[in-house]
Structures are given as C-alpha cells and as structure tokens.
C-alpha cells in the first residue's frame, strides 16, 4: 500500500470505530430524588427500556450498559410501558383495538423533557411515545419529589386516528425489577378486621391483588404493597424495599409477574375487568396516579 495512503486509511478506520461506539451508546433518562433513581434508556430502534429503580445513581451509563445476554426476540425486554404487540409476551400495560380493528401496538420513543416545577423540590419528566403503525400517542409522566424520595407516574393516551379506538387495558405504571427474590407484603381484611397484613414470597408466574367492588375497595384489598428485595423474610429494621400505592378509589389491579429470567414486572392501575373504554378520535385518556418510593434503611 502506498505510504501516503496508510495514514488516511488508519484515520478513516479509527473514525468509523469511534462513530460506531458513539452510536451504540443509548440515550439515558435518569429520574432522581435525594435517595433514589429511576433509570431508563432509548435503544437504537426507539424502544424505551427500564433498567433500575433503587438507590440514587448519578452516572447511570454503566447501569444501562449491563448486558442481559438473552435475545430480544424472547419477548421479555424490560419495556418502560409494555403493550400488546410486537414480541412482548408479558402482561401488557396497554392493550388497544385500533380504529381499523388491528390489535397490535408497538410504541417508540419520540422525545422527553425534564423541568423543575414551581416547587423547586419537584421535577417532572415527560416521555413521549408513538405507535409504529397507528396514530396513537402515549405520554409517560414521572414526577419526582426529591426530599420525600417519592416518584409518581401516570400515562396519557391520545387517539389521533380517524375513528374511535377501544382501550382494554390501561395501567398507570409498568415497573420491571431484578433481584434474587421478592417478598410481597400487602393488606387485606373485612368488616371489623380491616388492614390484616399478609406476606407472600413470589414465585415464577403471576399473582394479582385486585378489587371489583367499585368504590368500596380498601377494607378488603388495599391498592398498596411493599416488595422486599433479596430476602425471604420480612424485617422492619433492614433490607431493600420498594413500596407502591395507587391513588384510585375504584376497581384496581396490581399484577406481579416473575418471568423465567427472574425479573419481576409490576403492573398497577385501574382494573381492566369489564372496563373497556371507547376513546373517540382526537380524545385523550389519563390514567390514575401511581406512587412509588424506595428505601434501604
């Protein structure tokens, strides 16, 4: 090779490597409180993946770079808001029949914004998603209360199709969690014996806590829970705990699904039972607010 061409080829080759490395780095969304972080990333094809909810992380890049060593066509990607469609085999957060009868929904990233609200203790992140084939948009709202270590979330579903669509499932939140074990604590009861405490070690498969009793729900099944991570016994003095509560007085459902990779996917929101909702063209639907907190103390 001509000596004058060698530096040129070397420069071009190194440039391609650098460009490829830069392109491979995912866009990171890190929602933070004083003591916790909720970390997501955007893949090269626009999927928004969920990576972490736990202790605060200031540099989230290493978390998003952890490889799962499993094929994406297994249908178990940790999507930030799962849908019925594509290769998702988990219980979906959103299930829709579109105006043309199609039931496939695949959401992709459009943009996201983060701003501080009037109360400087509070920041709000909005992630905008759109369907790959239909005129359907979803906005995910995350509001972080720094001092309280609380993050609330809800979804807004917007119909830009020419006709009405039907919402079959419209959960407020989809939260994938990875640990060795999961101990679920929740409350149940009846008249004169409300707020009984129940502890359940989650195994592979699904467990649901739900109510179909309309406005008189919480004295039988309460729309709140705690998940103790990496422990098979409940202790009030130590351990990692994720707690959640749904700000909704009607029919609700909390679904806990542990898959074959030992990932726990938590769905929380209004109960989809007998709740099909027709959303007209140009209309939007806002889900109830889901409240999360994390503690390791």
Residue locations for each model-derived region?
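Boundary at the C-terminal end of the N-terminal hydrophobic targeting segment
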Residues: 20-24
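Bacterial N-terminal signal peptides that target proteins for export
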Residues: 1-9
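Short, structured beta-strand/loop micro-motifs enriched in basic residues and often containing a Trp
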Residues: 261-271
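Bacterial N-terminal signal peptides
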Residues: 10-18
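Short, Lys/Arg- and Gly-enriched loop/turn segments at beta-strand edges
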Residues: 293-297
